């Protein structure tokens, strides 16, 4: 009896030890498919905690693996795979042309590169407007096939509110988007700021409230006057994310290419929003590097010995030259011999 009790206690002690050594967080039931270190992976809980503490939430767009890695390294809270890829990656004048399949390619690339931020994927135009069931089906694909944690949809019409509610009820986190909604430029008459008169300003606040009621965990406020954004932020219990909406939102979002000053081409210069601060002129650095590369290749400066690392031993080279000559490739043998001589370090 005593021996059996000892064995049971030993097994229980080992189980407790394993549980304490587990990398699963204490407050979760299942580990999930991703590393669940609560000090690293950003979740809705982390965003809500930041919001309660009054700490601004940082959001930046990303569209591929390198940009996602940069966001991850910088400690950005939320990585948005935006349909703005239609403009800054694919070169279109609007966000309308990009397809769901194209968005999913961007989502998967970003998911491989950003391990810390909360990942949010835009629902592209034409993939959620017809019905709530279409919206849910699209949102499910963005999570299952794109590897996202949440989705974002634009607009505040009754059908959009219903769609947002249906997506949330399907178990998918949703960010709303009001103010300037680029997918609706046909109705808005272009990329025009909203909330600049009484009716429009009230509509911004009421629409944001309706999205909150539908279950959205956050709302993007785009291109509205700061007092309107401040009113919406004060009225809501969920965080607001501003873009061209002033400093009174719960957080801010900018497009990766815009804030880095990557696009120097006149096509993009004409659509770069004036509310965007450029924190770098990466485009100039890229242009300079490409021109320098072109010049060095043209002058046969690159690649030199230091960038030609793969060597062949003298004995193997001699044998290679002999074989070339046997095959009648005397000219090729001479070229190989001269190349070997030129690759020798200068004395």
From Swiss-Prot:
Matching NCBIfam families: panB, PRK00311.1
Species of the source: Arabidopsis thaliana
Feature: transit peptide: 1-48
Biological function: Catalyzes the reversible reaction in which hydroxymethyl group from 5,10-methylenetetrahydrofolate is transferred onto alpha-ketoisovalerate to form ketopantoate.
Cofactor: Mg(2+)
Catalytic activity reported: 3-methyl-2-oxobutanoate + (6R)-5,10-methylene-5,6,7,8-tetrahydrofolate + H2O = 2-dehydropantoate + (6S)-5,6,7,8-tetrahydrofolate
Enzyme class: transferase
Gene Ontology process terms (BP): pantothenate biosynthetic process
Keyword entries, A-Z: Magnesium, Metal-binding, Mitochondrion, Pantothenate biosynthesis, Transferase, Transit peptide
GO cellular component, as recorded: mitochondrion
EC code: 2.1.2.11
Subcellular location, record wording: Mitochondrion
Domain of life of the organism encoding this protein: Eukaryota
Catalytic residues, chain numbering: 222 (proton acceptor)
Pathway named in the protein's UniProt entry: Cofactor biosynthesis; (R)-pantothenate biosynthesis; (R)-pantoate from 3-methyl-2-oxobutanoate: step 1/2
Annotated positions binding 3-methyl-2-oxobutanoate: 83-84, 122, 152
Name of the protein: 3-methyl-2-oxobutanoate hydroxymethyltransferase 1, mitochondrial
Keyword Kinase attached: no
CDD domains: KPHMT-like
Cofactor binding mode and count: Binds 1 Mg(2+) ion per subunit.
Pfam families per record: Pantoate_transf
Family: Belongs to the PanB family.
């Amino acid at each position: 009896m005593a021996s059996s009790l000892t064995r049971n206690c030993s097994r229980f002690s080992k189980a407790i030890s394993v549980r304490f050594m587990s990398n699963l967080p204490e407050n979760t039931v299942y580990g999930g498919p991703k590393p669940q270190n609560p000090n690293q992976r950003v979740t809705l809980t982390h965003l809500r905690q930041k919001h309660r503490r009054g700490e601004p939430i940082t959001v930046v767009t990303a569209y591929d693996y390198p940009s996602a890695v940069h966001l991850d390294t910088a400690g950005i809270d939320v990585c948005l795979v935006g349909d703005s890829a239609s403009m800054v990656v694919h070169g279109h004048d609007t966000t309308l042309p990009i397809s769901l399949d194209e968005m999913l390619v961007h989502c998967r690339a970003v998911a491989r590169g950003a391990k810390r931020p909360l990942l949010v994927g835009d629902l592209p135009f034409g993939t959620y407007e017809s019905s709530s069931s279409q919206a849910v089906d699209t949102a499910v694909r963005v999570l299952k096939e794109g590897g996202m944690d949440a989705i974002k949809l634009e607009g505040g019409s009754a059908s959009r509110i219903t769609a947002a509610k249906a997506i949330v009820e399907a178990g998918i986190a949703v960010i709303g988007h009001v103010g300037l909604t680029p997918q609706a430029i046909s109705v808005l008459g272009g990329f025009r700021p909203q909330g600049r008169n009484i009716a429009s300003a009230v509509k911004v606040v009421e629409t944001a409230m309706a999205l909150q009621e539908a279950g959205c965990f956050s709302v993007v406020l785009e291109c509205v006057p700061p007092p309107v954004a401040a009113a919406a932020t004060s009225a809501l219990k969920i965080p607001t994310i501003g873009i061209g909406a002033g400093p009174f939102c719960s957080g801010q979002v900018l497009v990766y290419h815009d804030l880095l000053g990557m696009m120097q081409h006149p096509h993009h210069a004409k659509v770069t929003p004036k509310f965007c601060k450029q924190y770098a002129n990466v485009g100039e650095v890229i242009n300079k590097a490409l021109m320098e590369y072109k010049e060095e290749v043209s002058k046969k400066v690159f690649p030199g010995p230091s960038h030609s690392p793969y060597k062949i031993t003298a004995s193997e080279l001699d044998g290679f030259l002999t074989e070339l000559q046997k095959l009648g490739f005397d000219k090729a043998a001479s070229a190989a011999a001269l190349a070997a001589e030129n690759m020798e370090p200068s004395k």
